[in-house]
Amino acid sequence: FRHSKDGKFIYLRYELKKAIYVYTYKTGDRAPVIEKIQTISTTSTKKPDNLTAACAMRMSVDQKYIYCTNAGENTISVYKRDEETGLLTMICCLPISGAYPKDVAVFPDGRHIASVNHDSGTISFFKVDYEKGLLVMSGRSIPVNEPNCCAIVKIGD
């Protein structure tokens, strides 16, 4: 799961339901008050097959966007996050040029992502065009042996 920096919203990925559930979060007198406010699909089809699974979910550094990988369908979904309501709107769900995207890493600039593709043994890189709703592949994929996860860290200024 992921949560907003202000602590008001929780984003929970349901792998086999192929969905992201959005919750509000408030502190209560005795216990937290958590309320589901949205269920949104992670796939591009209305009836994805049973072999599709929502594998990984990441949030951009500025928390304006959420990304989710879909294994089986071999796509990445990109969502715009409303900072006031917490609700998500799908911008795109596009192929990643690899098989079984197990993770997605967001570059510090928030305009590039890397898809970690387990079954094809590759890492694919994309520029995200938020305005047009596109993932544009940036060069060739890098071969790696059965990758599972990835982190991209900014070093220096």
Regions found by a protein language model. Give the residues of each.
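Short loop/turn segments immediately following beta-strands, especially the blade-tip
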Residues: 23-33, 79-86, 127-134
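C-terminal hydrophobic structural anchor segments
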Residues: 77-127
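Beta-rich, blade/repeat-based domains predominating
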Residues: 1-9, 42-62, 97-112, 144-157
